[in-house]
Every structure is written in structure tokens, then in C-alpha cells.
Curated annotation (Swiss-Prot):
Listed HAMAP family: MPGP_rel (MF_00617)
Known catalytic reactions: 2-O-(alpha-D-mannosyl)-3-phosphoglycerate + H2O = (2R)-2-O-(alpha-D-mannosyl)-glycerate + phosphate
Protein name (Swiss-Prot/TrEMBL): Mannosyl-3-phosphoglycerate phosphatase
Active site location: D8 (nucleophile)
Keywords of the record: Cytoplasm, Hydrolase, Magnesium, Metal-binding
Amino acid sequence: MIKVIFLDIDKTLIPSYDPEPAEPVIKELKRKGFEIVFNSSKTRAEQEFYREKLDVKTPFISENGSAIYIPKNYFPFEIKGRETKDYIVIELGVKVEEIRRELRKLEDAYGIKYYANSTKEEIMEFTGMPEELVPLAMEREYSETIFKWSRESWKRTLSERGFTVTMGSRFYSVHGNCDKGKAAKILLELYRRLGPVRSYAVGDGYNDFPMFDVVDRAFLIGNLTHEKAQNVSSIMEVLEVIE
């Protein structure tokens, strides 16, 4: 049996931006034989930072399901996707340039602040992010994060123009017609080509709900509720009940 666990990062795997608290979690999941898949709103560059720090070498899903990054030669069969130096990339979202074109049309009227029109100092203030991680977060490929706005109707306007607006732990994300669940389902289908799969997911936000819908067992950290997910206080509690 192949055991796959999809993990949100912010407020799920790590409480803040420091990867150190996640080290015992990753170590225990590896000991239990899990394939660990980060499924986060974070960019490829951000996730590569955490993958390196935590020694995780499995596929990962970036920017709210916008792209699946599969390390070359990870699966023993051919995968259709865009090839880079290190990955086969299955793209489900739209290019960030398309999103930013629309945001530029709206930013003044709606008072919108996002990565591309914010300074490094503003981003640090909005997010609490350490300065050294800001450049990684700014390497956006398929989405933008909305930090501030003056009029609520910006969400409806972008939705009417064909974009998806998703609420995360703290901010809104604007991306294409994709979500964490669609991407997780595609990746699970690839794993099933290797044999029977048992799937799990852990998250804390509304953007994790589509991911919960496609796995066998889901865990929700915090006070939100989802009909399929078991509420837990932390990811450490998850480790106590999964094998």
C-alpha cells in the first residue's frame, strides 16, 4: 500500500516561517512510510526552500493547485507536462502575467495591494515574513496574493472576468480555474499506476477543502468545519492517529 499525505504549509506544517518545528513531523511521517506532498499556496521557490531544509524530495503542488512539480525520474513512466531542469510540470493554472494585467486595471479603484505593486518593506509588514524569504514569495508564476483592499466588490469583479478568488489562512489568492483538490486528484492517479493508494490530507483553511474532498482521510486544524474532515488541534495530533 502506497501512503500519500498532502500537507498545507502555513499554519499547518509550520506555525510561522521557521521550518525547524516541522522537522520532527517530517521525520515521523518518513518513519511511517508516507509519501509527503506539500500542497500549498506558496510558490515553487518557497517550497523548494522548505523541501531542502526538511529533506523532502517528493512531488509538490504550488500556488493553490496551479501546478504540480514532479521531480524527474520520480515515477517510472512517462508523464505529459512541461519539462524543466529538475521537474516535469503539470500546469493547471494561468500565467501570473495574465492575472496582473487585470489587477493593474483594478488596483486604484479598489485600493488593492498585492506582491507586484508592493515594496519589500510593505510585504514584510503585511505578512510578518523574514526579509530573506520575501524574494522567494515574489517569484510567483500562477497567482497573486491580495493583502489589502478598500472595496469588497473586487472579488466579484475578478470572478466575473474568469479568475478564481480563494481565501487562505490570512489572505486572498487570485488564480486560474484550479484548486488544491484538482491537483491532488491528478497526482493520486499517478501514484495509483504504481499500486493501491491510501491518501490523507491536513490543512487549516477554506482553500484546503477541495483537497479534503479527494482523499480517504482528512484532518482540519482549527475551528472551521468540513463534513469529511476530522478536527484536530495540531499536526502532532494527526501523527498519533495515522499509520
